[in-house]
């Protein structure tokens, strides 16, 4: 009976994986014992007695002593032998020649079919970006999983800490709450910035994974408790109530002596959350930004230092995993209510600000707005609705933290008036904002959101992007004045004058000159 090509391919893939695994083990061994070139046989300097009269415990002691003695006699490697060993180790990890890029008509290249926007995940096909021997010929995506963290994976493999052929065990990782398929998942224009099936990969493509294809989840869904000191304060003030369902009492605190404290232990919030990695469908991303796909590919290639040549040489591959930060969805209340239009939905779309969100900087309103939105989401969930906070990793308006701090320096040395707020950023970055909210609504369509009752945001860009995507917003409201730190008045006034929503007094360009932030001299002690 003839053996089918599929079986032969599977056997070959398994042999390739075994070879790489064996090479990795050998590389680890060489790194531990490599005082000499790995090609040289190591002299046996340890002799272990095996006399029948020697008890087992004694034999173990002899072995340990002999190994310690041998370790002390190991010669210090010279730069030449170390370099040779490292070179040999590199060959063991990567035995083939370096493949800088591939081409559509190259021999053996056969990408796994991928039809973006297909209603059935099997018809759509898995996203495969792996360069492992078992998957490289069937790659249908450019880039690597984990975004910017893919660099740490590469370091871990190079140092021998991680086997490149490690096969994850997904048996207990399925989502504890359901994010079910929506009609938008089958619309190639609604979701173009991540894989809507990313959290279902281990289930949908179990057979393909077992056959050797390196297919990985790009979304993870879990449940957790959220604990913030600001929420404790809100409970003390009576602004949030402990209902035992959404808001729970924290366990009692402990005194220094270990006894139970009678002090207020605070509260915690019952939430569901999802981490979503970027997976770009290039034709859809290009269309969303109003540019050609070829221009998008060229810009991504050139302005990442030429990191991804296949953006140019593989026009047949339409999916790209960019090395950028992910987003996180925080859900307050029943996740099933997100797609139920009869339920009231409160939303905050928040772009990362590490200085304020985590470390409490008062130069901007980011943390107060985030905290206020979380409280609003909790109140909405307790009234029978659902709250959603989407946290995007777009530090410093996607300009980065270094650029942001340089702008801070310019602002403080220049008087820090609101009329110069955006100009200060443009002088350094060349643009006032690079967040480009066109891709942001994708996650709302993934969650099944069809209307937003309460939008806790003043951003005109976020509002316009969401409404343009087909989701109506019934109410928007701004941050209450009493929550705005004095030094962040510069930011908020400049944004209102530039078009941000405000239910209060409108601010003119003439008013901006009068809004001035704190100077450095005022903070010196």
Spans of model-derived segments:
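Catalytic domains of riboflavin
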Residues: 2-5, 12-14, 30, 42-525
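Long, heptad-repeat coiled-coil alpha-helices used as oligomerization/scaffolding rods
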Residues: 4, 22-25
């Amino acid at each position: 009976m003839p053996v089918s090509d599929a079986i032969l391919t599977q056997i070959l893939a398994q042999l390739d994986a075994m070879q790489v695994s064996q090479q990795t083990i050998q590389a680890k061994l060489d790194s531990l014992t490599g005082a000499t070139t790995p090609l040289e046989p190591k002299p046996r300097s340890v002799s272990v007695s095996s006399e029948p009269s020697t008890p087992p415990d004694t034999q173990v002691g002899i072995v340990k002593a002999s190994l310690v003695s041998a370790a002390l006699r190991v010669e210090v490697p010279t730069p030449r032998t170390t370099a040779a060993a490292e070179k040999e180790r590199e060959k063991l990890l990567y035995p083939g020649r370096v493949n800088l890029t591939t081409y559509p008509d190259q021999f053996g290249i056969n990408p796994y079919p991928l039809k973006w926007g297909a209603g059935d995940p099997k018809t759509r096909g898995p996203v495969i970006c792996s360069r492992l021997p078992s998957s490289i010929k069937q790659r249908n995506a450019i880039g690597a999983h984990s975004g910017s963290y893919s660099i740490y994976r590469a370091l871990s493999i190079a140092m021998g800490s991680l086997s490149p052929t490690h096969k994850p065990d997904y048996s207990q990782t399925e989502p504890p709450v359901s994010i079910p398929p929506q009609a938008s998942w089958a619309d190639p224009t609604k979701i173009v910035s991540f894989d809507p099936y990313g959290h279902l990969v281990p289930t949908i493509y179990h057979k393909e994974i077992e056959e050797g294809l390196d297919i990985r989840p790009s979304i993870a869904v879990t449940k957790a408790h959220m604990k913030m000191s600001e929420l404790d304060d809100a409970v003390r003030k009576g602004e949030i109530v402990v209902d035992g369902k959404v808001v729970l009492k924290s366990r009692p605190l402990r005194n220094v002596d270990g006894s139970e404290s009678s002090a207020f232990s605070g509260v915690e919030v019952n939430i569901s959350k999802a981490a979503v990695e970027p997976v770009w469908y290039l034709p859809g991303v290009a269309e969303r930004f109003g540019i050609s796909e070829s221009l998008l590919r060229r810009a991504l290639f050139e302005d990442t230092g030429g990191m991804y040549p296949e953006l140019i040489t593989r026009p047949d591959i339409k999916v790209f995993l960019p090395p950028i930060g992910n987003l996180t969805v925080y859900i307050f209340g029943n996740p099933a209510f997100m797609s139920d239009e009869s339920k009231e939905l409160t939303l905050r779309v928040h772009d990362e600000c590490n200085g304020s969100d985590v470390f409490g900087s008062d130069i901007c309103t980011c943390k107060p707005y985030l905290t206020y939105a979380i409280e609003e989401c909790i109140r909405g969930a307790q009234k029978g609705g659902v709250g959603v906070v989407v946290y995007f990793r777009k530090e410093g308006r996607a300009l980065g933290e270094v650029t942001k701090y340089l702008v801070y320096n310019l602002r403080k040395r220049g008087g820090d008036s609101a009329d110069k707020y955006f100009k200060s950023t443009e002088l350094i970055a060349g643009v006032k904002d690079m967040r480009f909210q066109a891709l942001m609504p994708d996650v709302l369509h993934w969650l099944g959101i069809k209307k937003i009752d309460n939008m806790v945001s003043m951003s005109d860009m976020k509002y316009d992007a969401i409404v343009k995507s087909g989701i109506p917003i019934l109410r928007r409201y701004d941050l209450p004045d009493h929550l705005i730190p004095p030094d962040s008045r510069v930011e908020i006034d400049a944004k209102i004058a530039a078009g941000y929503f405000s239910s209060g007094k409108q601010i003119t360009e003439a008013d901006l000159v009068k809004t001035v932030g704190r100077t450095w001299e005022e903070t010196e002690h």
